[in-house]
Protein backbone atom coordinates (compact mmCIF):
# COMPACT_ATOMS: atom_id res chain seq x y z
CA UNK A 1 0.00 0.00 0.00
CA UNK A 2 2.83 2.38 0.86
CA UNK A 3 4.39 1.64 -2.53
CA UNK A 4 1.22 2.61 -4.36
CA UNK A 5 0.91 5.87 -2.42
CA UNK A 6 4.58 6.66 -3.08
CA UNK A 7 4.11 5.92 -6.79
CA UNK A 8 1.07 8.22 -7.02
CA UNK A 9 2.95 10.97 -5.16
CA UNK A 10 5.84 10.67 -7.64
CA UNK A 11 3.46 10.97 -10.59
CA UNK A 12 1.91 14.09 -9.08
CA UNK A 13 5.36 15.61 -8.57
CA UNK A 14 6.34 14.87 -12.16
CA UNK A 15 3.16 16.60 -13.36
CA UNK A 16 4.06 19.72 -11.37
CA UNK A 17 7.66 19.79 -12.65
CA UNK A 18 6.76 19.19 -16.30
CA UNK A 19 3.78 21.53 -16.24
CA UNK A 20 3.16 23.63 -19.32
CA UNK A 21 0.85 26.50 -20.09
CA UNK A 22 -1.48 27.64 -22.84
CA UNK A 23 -2.08 31.18 -24.03
CA UNK A 24 -1.59 33.94 -26.57
CA UNK A 25 2.10 34.32 -27.41
CA UNK A 26 3.46 37.86 -27.34
CA UNK A 27 6.20 39.62 -29.26
CA UNK A 28 8.95 41.84 -27.81
CA UNK A 29 6.63 44.86 -27.29
CA UNK A 30 4.16 42.74 -25.30
CA UNK A 31 1.54 42.58 -28.07
CA UNK A 32 -0.13 39.36 -29.20
CA UNK A 33 0.97 37.81 -32.49
CA UNK A 34 -1.80 38.88 -34.87
CA UNK A 35 -3.33 36.45 -37.35
CA UNK A 36 -6.30 36.07 -39.67
CA UNK A 37 -8.55 33.14 -40.50
CA UNK A 38 -6.68 30.55 -42.54
CA UNK A 39 -3.28 31.16 -40.93
CA UNK A 40 -3.38 28.17 -38.57
CA UNK A 41 -0.17 26.72 -40.03
CA UNK A 42 1.68 30.01 -39.44
CA UNK A 43 0.53 30.16 -35.81
CA UNK A 44 1.39 26.50 -35.31
CA UNK A 45 4.91 27.18 -36.61
CA UNK A 46 5.34 30.19 -34.31
CA UNK A 47 4.13 28.18 -31.32
CA UNK A 48 6.39 25.22 -32.02
CA UNK A 49 9.37 27.57 -32.51
CA UNK A 50 8.72 28.69 -28.93
CA UNK A 51 8.75 25.00 -27.87
CA UNK A 52 4.97 24.72 -27.61
CA UNK A 53 3.19 21.53 -28.61
CA UNK A 54 0.88 23.22 -31.15
CA UNK A 55 -1.06 26.36 -31.97
CA UNK A 56 -3.76 27.85 -34.14
CA UNK A 57 -5.25 31.20 -35.13
CA UNK A 58 -7.87 32.13 -32.55
CA UNK A 59 -8.64 35.30 -34.50
CA UNK A 60 -7.26 37.89 -34.00
CA UNK A 61 -4.24 36.28 -32.32
CA UNK A 62 -2.22 33.04 -32.13
CA UNK A 63 -3.15 30.67 -29.30
CA UNK A 64 -0.53 28.10 -28.25
CA UNK A 65 -0.73 24.86 -26.29
CA UNK A 66 1.97 23.28 -24.15
CA UNK A 67 4.32 26.26 -23.83
CA UNK A 68 7.23 26.04 -21.40
CA UNK A 69 7.01 28.23 -18.31
CA UNK A 70 9.77 30.58 -19.52
CA UNK A 71 7.75 31.73 -22.58
CA UNK A 72 5.84 34.95 -21.98
CA UNK A 73 2.15 34.91 -22.80
CA UNK A 74 -0.44 37.68 -22.89
CA UNK A 75 -1.78 38.66 -19.47
CA UNK A 76 -4.61 41.20 -19.48
CA UNK A 77 -3.67 42.28 -15.94
CA UNK A 78 -0.14 43.23 -17.03
CA UNK A 79 -0.78 44.33 -20.62
CA UNK A 80 2.17 46.37 -21.89
CA UNK A 81 1.25 46.33 -25.57
CA UNK A 82 2.02 49.65 -27.21
CA UNK A 83 3.11 51.30 -23.95
From Swiss-Prot:
GO molecular-function terms, A-Z: sodium channel inhibitor activity; toxin activity
Residues modified as Cysteine amide: 81
InterPro entries registered for this protein in UniProt: LCN-type_CS_alpha_beta_dom, Scorpion_toxin-like, Scorpion_toxin-like_sf, Scorpion_toxinL, Scorpion_toxinL/defensin
Pfam families: Toxin_3
Subcellular compartments: Secreted
Signal peptide (UniProt feature, chain positions): 1-20
Disulfide bonds: 31-81, 35-57, 43-62, 47-64
All copies of domain LCN-type CS-alpha/beta, residue ranges: 21-82
Recorded GO CC terms: extracellular region
Origin superkingdom: Eukaryota
Family: Belongs to the long (4 C-C) scorpion toxin superfamily. Sodium channel inhibitor family. Beta subfamily.
Role, per record: Inhibits the sodium currents (Nav) in an apparent irreversible manner. Produces small depolarization and induces repetitive firing in squid axons. Is specific for arthropods (crickets, triatomides, crabs and squids), but is non-toxic to mice. Shows antibacterial activity against both Gram-positive and Gram-negative bacteria.
Protein name per UniProt: Toxin TdNa5
Organism, scientific name: Tityus discrepans
Amino acid sequence: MKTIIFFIACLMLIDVVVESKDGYIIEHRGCKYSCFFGTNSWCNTECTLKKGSSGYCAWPACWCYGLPDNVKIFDSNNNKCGK
